[in-house]
Amino acid sequence: RTGLMGACARGVHSKGGRTVGVIPEKLNQPGIPFEHCSEMIVTKDMHERKATMERLSSGFVTLPGGVGTLEELMEVLTLNQLGYIDAPVVIFNQGGFYDNLLAQFDALAKAGFMHTECLKLFSVAATPEEAIEKLIGFRKAKLPDKIKEAVKGHEAHSAG
């Protein structure tokens, strides 16, 4: 209902679009969720909320936000990197809001803590129109074989 997500929901609703709200029980209080959602899914907690959003989503746009937004961004990047999801991730860098984070990603790659191919797991947009174009034009990054092999090995070990 509030903030940028609320603004997005109101905009979609005003144009006759469908909105799905996903909210943990603890936050499902009067005045918090957007009251005109086409569908409201109440989850047990934040972990279940993220899993539900990941399952329902075909792409992700990170708007300017706080620590919760950063945590969600890191999770979808990690899930993409490990092959658990295959979805576009667009960082909406309105007014340079995420410049420092993007510089940190570059620093991680230069220091060897992040493979340079992982920098292709997301794209950056400066306008809403560009964000939509990036979602539509999504191409999955080619990740190093060692990452793919590690995931396959872990899945085989977990299944056995």
Regions found by a protein language model. Give the residues of each.
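A cross-family phosphate/adenosyl-ligand binding-site feature
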Residues: 1-56, 95-129, 133-134, 138-160
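Short glycine/serine/threonine-rich phosphate/pyrophosphate-binding segments
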Residues: 2-7, 68-75
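A glycine- and small-aliphatic-rich helix-loop capping segment at beta-alpha/alpha-beta transitions
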Residues: 13-15, 75-83
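Thr-Gly-centered strand-to-loop micro-motif
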Residues: 43, 62-64, 92
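Short glycine-/polar-rich loops that comprise or flank the Walker A/P-loop
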Residues: 58, 85-87, 120
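Short, glycine-rich nucleotide/cofactor-binding loops
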Residues: 60-70
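Glycine-rich phosphate/nucleotide-binding loop
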Residues: 63, 84-87, 95-100
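Arginine/glycine-rich "motif VI" loop of SF2 helicases in the C-terminal RecA-like domain
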Residues: 79-87, 113-115
